[in-house]
A protein has these predicted regions:
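Structural motif
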Residues: 48-56
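Short, exposed beta-strand "edge-strand" segments with a Pro/Gly-rich flavor and a Y/T-containing core
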Residues: 19-23, 44-47, 148-154, 191
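Glycine/Thr-rich phosphate-binding loops of Rossmann-like dinucleotide-binding domains
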Residues: 14, 49-50, 81, 124
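Residues that cap or flank secondary-structure elements
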Residues: 17, 21, 53, 94, ...
Length: 240
């Protein structure tokens, strides 16, 4: 069996019935992996690289991950929280340093690290145009870290932003946690949430990550089902 350890925030984390239909990307990812792949979802709501490390969550992964495993590293949303010193990191300074700590954990145990940029928030202006992103500098920081540490980067940010721009305001609403009254017992009056995902959104963006991995060299691409099967779930062009 091959094991994926996934470190991240609420866009990745496991959700249960009390927050349904919210779904983390990692919860939907096994639709795209081969049968011998097992996912261990260590993502936790509200965590940044800093708080994840400070709470010893990376240390837990270090104790469990072994040679030949994979470490998916997906942060950015909460590293932006400039008014919260327990979470905030500077995108081109300690954010990169922290990402290096994740890489060290993987490589010290003989595992393969992967950086995944943040999924874009669904924020449109009154004219129906997607607003400038709050994630940009952290995406750049993660790409810098990828070059510095020689780690592959799956650019979910760009893929998700392109999808939102193409799909538009109204049609993209169903992928995010925008609830009408009565749709969820825990939010009887409804909810507007353009950061977190319903199952449809988690499945979509998990597929984008799978597509990105399938385009990498080994040992990454062999995690993913073949291109024809992948295309069944994604509206993408494929050569075979």
């Amino acid at each position: 069996m091959r094991h994926i350890f996934w470190a991240g925030d609420s866009t990745v984390a496991c959700n249960k019935f009390n927050t349904y239909p919210q779904t983390g990307i990692a919860q939907a990812f096994d639709r795209y992996t081969k049968e011998d792949v097992v996912i261990y979802n260590h993502a936790v709501n509200g965590r940044s690289t800093k708080s994840f490390i400070d709470e010893s969550r990376l240390a837990v992964i270090y104790d469990e991950i072994t040679k030949g495993d994979y470490l998916f590293i997906q942060f950015g949303h909460n590293d932006e929280k400039i008014n919260d010193p327990t979470r905030y990191t500077k995108p081109h300074e300690d954010f990169i340093v922290n990402l290096g700590k994740f890489v060290n954990v993987a490589r010290n145990k003989g595992a393969y690290p992967v950086f995944i940029t943040s999924v874009e928030r669904r924020l449109f202006d009154e004219k129906g145009n997607l607003k400038p992103s709050e994630h940009t500098e952290y995406v750049k920081g993660m790409k810098e870290a990828g070059e510095k540490f020689n780690v592959p980067v799956v650019d979910l940010f760009t893929m998700s932003r392109n999808f939102l721009e193409k799909t538009g305001d109204e049609a993209s609403k169903k992928y995010y946690m925008n609830l009408v009254a009565g749709e969820a017992d825990w939010a009887p009056e409804g909810k507007i949430d353009n950061s977190h995902l319903k199952y449809e959104g988690a499945l979509l963006y998990a597929g984008m990550i799978a597509k990105g991995l399938s385009e990498l060299d080994e040992p990454y691409r062999s995690l993913i089902i073949d291109n024809l099967a992948l295309a069944k779930y994604l509206d993408i062009e494929t050569n075979g």
